[in-house]
Amino acid sequence: PFAVDVYGEHIHLQEYDTGWLMADDEYEDWLAQVIEAVVFVTGFSPDDIHLKHRERQKGTQQYEKTGRAGEDFEHGRRFWVNLDKYLDTGLFLDHRNTRKKVGDSAEGKRFLNLFSYTGSFTVYAATGGAVSSETVDLSNTYLDWAKRNFELNGIDTAQHQIIRADVFQYLQTASQEGKRFDLIVMDPPSFSNSKKMPDTLDIQRDHARLIDGAMSLLDSDGLLYFSNNLRSFTLNEAVAQRYETKDISKQSVPDDFRNKKIHQCWEIRHKAV
């Protein structure tokens, strides 16, 4: 199977490995037919279709890395996307509704972006009028990418800081320093065993601790967006008891996504005293 995503005037066509094996010639013919079908259905030129597929007979290298990249526009914001080189493009389309909600509500807010990836939520917040922000991730690659996205949108990095840190450690330090935010986005991976982290991350196991840490930084009338893409995920009952939680997944997943379980998303607030 393939996933077809439209980025402006380009199509990102990604093959998913099901273990189905074909001879090399048969496989190449099949790929050509897939591209021909996409051209027919979408009307895009073959030159604007970026095929990301399994390389064959290339040892441990699983995907082609041709490295073509360029800018993409979303709701008036500019983003640097790479449609060929990496498994991900730099901009997850399934969260474009959530990004717009952040941009629409950021005016005058202090914003925090945890597990920030390439900083797209911060781009929306900053261009939406946030007075300050902190963008936190452990990956230098993604933080450099975020900086590039900031530059594309004229965002001042003195006012909108990019911070390399383990999120667990950041939450502890920020709480000790008395930092407060009005709007927080936390979109962690389902699992991570990065050597840069002191411990592994298992979002089902660890999400309550992460949410508690984020809520300790959230102003009394603030809002946390918490999301993840673990299909089997269930929100900890203690979290639902401690805070006001609202599942907005049906609104956050765009209508044009066939897979309505591509992520789950909650609005979380402090309970009124």
Which residues does each PLM region occupy?
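C-terminal catalytic and target-recognition region of SAM-dependent MTase-like enzymes
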Residues: 209, 222-273
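Conserved SAM-binding motif I beta-strand of class I
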Residues: 132-137
